[in-house]
From Swiss-Prot:
Organism: Periplaneta americana
Family assignment from sequence similarity: Belongs to the tropomyosin family.
Cited SUPFAM superfamilies: Tropomyosin
GO biological process: regulation of muscle contraction
Keyword check for Repeat: yes
Keywords, comma-separated and alphabetical: Allergen, Coiled coil, Muscle protein, Repeat
Chain's role: Tropomyosin, in association with the troponin complex, plays a central role in the calcium dependent regulation of muscle contraction.
PANTHER family named among the record's database cross-references: TROPOMYOSIN
Full protein name: Tropomyosin Per a 7.0103
UniProt GO MF annotations: protein homodimerization activity
Length: 284
C-alpha cells in the first residue's frame, strides 16, 4: 500500500513537473511567436526602406544623367564661343594687315607729295628763268599736273580702302556683341547647374544605406558629384576667360577705329595740301 502511495505521489509530482514544463513551453512558444512577428515586421520595414532607397537612388541617377547632359551642352556652347573668339582674332589680324597696306600707300602718297613740292620749287626757279627769257615750259607743267592727278587717284583709292576697313570693323563689333550675349547665357546656365547639383547633394545626404551594395553605390555617386563639381568650376573658368578675350578684342577694335580716324585726317591734310599746291601752280 505504501508503495502504491509513493508511486501515486511520484506520478503526481511528475504530472506537476510536466504541467510546469508545458506552461514553460507555452510561454517560450508565445515569446518565440512575438519574436518571429517582430522579426517579420522588421524584415518588412527593412524591405520597404530598401525599396525606398532604391527608388531614391534611381531618381538620383536620372538627375545625374540630366546634369551630365546639361554640362555637355555647356561644353559645346563654350567651344562655340572659343571658335568665335578665334574667328574674331583672325579678322582683327586681317584688318591690321589692311591697315599696314594703307599705311604703305600713305607713305607712297607722302613721297609723291614731297616730289611734287620739290618739282614746284624747281618750277618756280624755271619760271623766273623763263620770265627773264620770255619762254614757257609747258612740258614741266604737264608733268606736274600728271603727278597731282596720280596723287589724287591714290588718295581716293585709300579712302575707299578705309571705308572697307570701317565696314569690317562694324561687322567685328556685331560679332563681339553676339559673343557677349552667349557668354551671359553661359553664366545663367552655370547658375542653374549649381542649383541642380545642390539638390542632388541634399538627396544623397538624406539616403540611409543599410546594405554594402547601397554604400558602394553612394560612394560612386559622391565621386560623380565631385567630378561634376570640378567640371563646373572648369566651365566657369573657361567662361571668364572667354569674357576677358571679348573685352580684349573690343579694346583692339577701339584702337583700330582711332587709328582709322587718324589716318583719314592725315589723308585729308594731304589732299588739302595737294589742292593748294595745284591752285598755286595753275595761278602761275
Amino acid at each position: 500500500m505504501d508503495a502504491i502511495k509513493k508511486k501515486m505521489q511520484a506520478m503526481k509530482l511528475e504530472k506537476d513537473n510536466a504541467m510546469d514544463r508545458a506552461l514553460l513551453c507555452e510561454q517560450q512558444a508565445r515569446d518565440a511567436n512575438l519574436r518571429a512577428e517582430k522579426a517579420e515586421e522588421e524584415a518588412r520595414s527593412l524591405q520597404k526602406k530598401t525599396q525606398q532607397i532604391e527608388n531614391d537612388l534611381d531618381q538620383t541617377m536620372e538627375q545625374l544623367m540630366q546634369v551630365n547632359a546639361k554640362l555637355d551642352e555647356k561644353d559645346k556652347a563654350l567651344q562655340n564661343a572659343e571658335s568665335e573668339v578665334a574667328a574674331l582674332n583672325r579678322r582683327i589680324q586681317l584688318l591690321e594687315e589692311d591697315l599696314e597696306r594703307s599705311e604703305e600707300r600713305l607713305a607712297t602718297a607722302t613721297a609723291k607729295l614731297a616730289e611734287a613740292s620739290q618739282a614746284d620749287d624747281e618750277s618756280e626757279r624755271a619760271r623766273k628763268i623763263l620770265e627773264s627769257k620770255g619762254l614757257a615750259d609747258e612740258e614741266r607743267m604737264d608733268a606736274l599736273e600728271n603727278q597731282l592727278k596720280e596723287a589724287r587717284f591714290m588718295a581716293e583709292e585709300a579712302d575707299k580702302k578705309y571705308d572697307e576697313v570701317a565696314r569690317k570693323l562694324a561687322m567685328v563689333e556685331a560679332d563681339l556683341e553676339r559673343a557677349e550675349e552667349r557668354a551671359e547665357s553661359g553664366e545663367s546656365k552655370i547658375v542653374e547647374l549649381e542649383e541642380e547639383l545642390r539638390v542632388v547633394g541634399n538627396n544623397l545626404k538624406s539616403l540611409e544605406v543599410s546594405e554594402e551594395k547601397a554604400n558602394l553605390r553612394e560612394e560612386e555617386y559622391k565621386q560623380q558629384i565631385k567630378t561634376l563639381t570640378t567640371r563646373l568650376k572648369e566651365a566657369e573658368a573657361r567662361a571668364e576667360f572667354a569674357e576677358r578675350s571679348v573685352q580684349k578684342l573690343q579694346k583692339e577694335v577701339d584702337r583700330l577705329e582711332d587709328e582709322l580716324v587718324h589716318e583719314k585726317e592725315k589723308y585729308k591734310f594731304i589732299c588739302d595740301d595737294l589742292d593748294m599746291t595745284f591752285t598755286e601752280l595753275v595761278g602761275y
